[in-house]
Regions:
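Short, glycine-/aromatic-enriched active-site segment of Class I SAM-dependent methyltransferases
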Residues: 186-218, 223-228
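Conserved catalytic loop of SAM-dependent methyltransferase domains
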Residues: 237-269
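A SAM-dependent methyltransferase catalytic signature shared across enzymes that methylate proteins
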Residues: 4, 223-241
Length: 308
């Protein structure tokens, strides 16, 4: 038998390494065998925060707290550029986590409301927000809000769309609780990006470290993210990168997936870099993050959408 070429080897390797996910018609990946919704909800409530999974902690370092506030300031800036500076905002945050974004907008005079499977994140970071939290299944809570004719200027959802069992249904429900001239701000993990695929192909990464069969059914990349919203009746107003930590993976000394002992230092450095950029110029940082997103880079992607 003749030896296969490097390109043929890469194709075979890519097929083998993507055996648990499939690319859908929108262009992003999803699990071939998705978790049962009830089991996923139990995982969120009992493990996700308590075991500090997914980057959530009980006590964040100073640079992380500064980063969260800076990102909230940037998000408000993006939203205000579209909706106007003087508009009184009513905000719904689906998957509100520890409540840092809610607290920012509450401090700015907005009316806020949060939805989350678990109260643990808010309880241990912003307990003053517990009266604004609706705990439980986001589908059921949204249906109740629809029944009560509740509408919002902004519906925010961070790292939720890629974790729910039926993202199409979530977008359809959101469409019914956002005002016609309102916005949807949605952040997802950026997975199976061209950058990640290349690192897998060239051996920099030995496996798909971001694959989470228990709690993460959908894996968005930039194009698939935008296509998915477009197909569900939304217009994209802009996409922005967040968390540029993945660039560390190109250095064997800071490849935090292969060398997890470097992870905390890499995260701390990433926070410091983005905080420094924000301090130099918040507006320029927003523009930089938009350019990074255009190239599909960034550990997370923030999309701003309106209803068509």
């Amino acid at each position: 038998c003749g030896a296969i070429t490097i390109e043929e080897y890469r194709v075979v390797k890519e097929i083998n390494m993507l055996d648990k996910v499939k690319k859908n018609k929108y262009g992003f990946y999803e699990l071939k065998n998705k978790p049962i919704a009830e089991e996923q909800a139990l995982n969120f409530e009992e493990e996700y925060y308590q075991n500090e999974e997914g980057g959530h902690e009980n006590n964040y370092p100073t640079e992380a707290l500064e980063y969260f506030e800076n990102k909230a300031v940037q998000r408000e800036y993006i939203i205000r550029k579209i909706l106007g500076e003087d508009r009184k905002l009513r905000i719904l945050d689906i998957g509100c986590g520890e409540g840092f974004l809610l607290q920012h907008f509450l401090n700015k005079g907005a009316e806020v409301c949060g939805i989350d499977y678990s109260k643990y994140g808010i309880e241990h970071n912003n307990p003053q927000l517990l009266p604004f939290l609706m705990q439980g299944d986001c589908y059921k809570i949204l249906e109740k809000l629809i029944e009560n004719n509740e509408v919002f200027d902004v519906v925010n959802t961070d790292c939720t769309l890629d974790m729910v069992p039926n993202p199409e249904l979530l977008l359809q429900l959101i469409k019914r609780v956002v005002k016609k001239d309102g916005l949807i701000a949605c952040k997802v993990s950026n997975n199976y990006s061209d950058f990640q695929i290349e690192l897998l192909k060239n051996g920099t990464l030995s496996k798909e470290f971001w694959l989470d069969e228990k709690g993460h059914p959908s894996y968005f990349n930039k194009d698939g993210f935008v296509n998915f919203f477009d197909a569900n009746g939304y217009e994209c107003k802009g996409v922005y990168s967040e968390r540029l930590i993945e660039l560390n993976l190109m250095n064997e000394l800071t490849n935090y997936y292969e060398k997890p002992e470097t992870g905390k230092a890499c995260w701390k450095t990433a926070f410091k870099i983005e905080n420094m950029l924000h301090d130099l110029s918040m507006e320029d940082t927003v523009n930089i993050m938009r350019l990074f997103a255009n190239m599909g880079l960034g550990r997370e992607l923030l999309g701003i959408f309106s209803v068509k």
